[in-house]
């Protein structure tokens, strides 16, 4: 569970200026549990026993799991202790208006400074509820219960909250740690194949720039001779490995005072690909295209070897993730994306590219990316994506008939 305390500090007088000094110490737990809402599972009860709670849940999770979740609350908490709020979860609903709606619902339920917000759903719900928790009464506790693979390996371990504004993704938000994060992989059994692929993009990301064993575990799982499909449980060494590597990368730099972040691999061109497509591309799909283009650029610059570049494309291909969008990935559009990121990251693009599988490196400035090299990478990805489109037919990436559980 999270703790925040002020340590050390003091006050000094310098002429007419009073200087205040304080330091905050942050900590939070990411729990991986089975059967989180089984009647005999005590974890949520122990965390929330005496708290008043507003439980925010996505419509699809409410439809698929709502009765079981509500029964848990009926069993363990008094009726006046909690209230449910169903939140719309499209990118167009990831807005300050919905954050204010959460705050208004919390006020109407008389949630005080000791109250709790509980977020149950995918990344959009978690981001909005976290933002609301960070500003309601200047900050109350909240618990994250991610129900998507992206949520469990990425959003679960970080402290960022945010919503979209003026056509920009996550333009406003805060850094605010959850009181606790509760992962239950049972939720993934009702996740649609597309959402599973999006989560896999984030796991592949960590394998490519931080840990080659994550990448090879996924290769062994999805590629011949094993060739497992998405309905098979993912290798836990890859899932937990991605979470551990994510925490290791985030922990020394939770508030992003250093804007050189390996975890930003796949998150440079992808922001433009998502927004310009009107969010027709899901986040993980945009990340996959970004990773493919960044790997191709690294290869064009003579950094990433040809064999490893082919391995990267092969894994993305067999999982069923897109690697290129001809309509969106023009040289002008991708160069514009770099310029926008240059502003966002303090006039340094800090573009992460794979030097080899398991090791990332930075191209810090715009001048480190020759426009002609980017153009060559885009032309090559255009050709390779045609091969990818043909090979994907009948691959392990074919859609599975699953209910939507995002």
From Swiss-Prot:
InterPro entries: Dehydroquinate_synthase, DHQS/DOIS_N, DHQS_C, EEVS-like. One of its GO terms (molecular function) is 3-dehydroquinate synthase activity. It catalyses: D-sedoheptulose 7-phosphate = 2-epi-5-epi-valiolone + phosphate. Its cofactor is NAD(+); Co(2+); Zn(2+). It is an enzyme of class 4 (lyase). SUPFAM superfamilies: Dehydroquinate synthase-like. Zn(2+) binds at residues 202, 267, 283. Its EC number is 4.2.3.152. One of its GO terms (biological process) is antibiotic biosynthetic process. NAD(+) binds at residues 91-94, 123-127, 147-148, 160, 169, 187-190. Signal peptide: none annotated. Keywords: Cobalt, Lyase, Metal-binding, NAD, Nucleotide-binding, Zinc. Catalyzes the cyclization of D-sedoheptulose 7-phosphate to 2-epi-5-epi-valiolone. PANTHER family: 2-EPI-5-EPI-VALIOLONE SYNTHASE, 3-DEHYDROQUINATE SYNTHASE. Belongs to the sugar phosphate cyclases superfamily. EEVS-like family. This is 2-epi-5-epi-valiolone synthase. It comes from Stigmatella aurantiaca (strain DW4/3-1). The lineage of its organism: Bacteria, Pseudomonadati, Myxococcota, Myxococcia, Myxococcales. The gene is gacC.
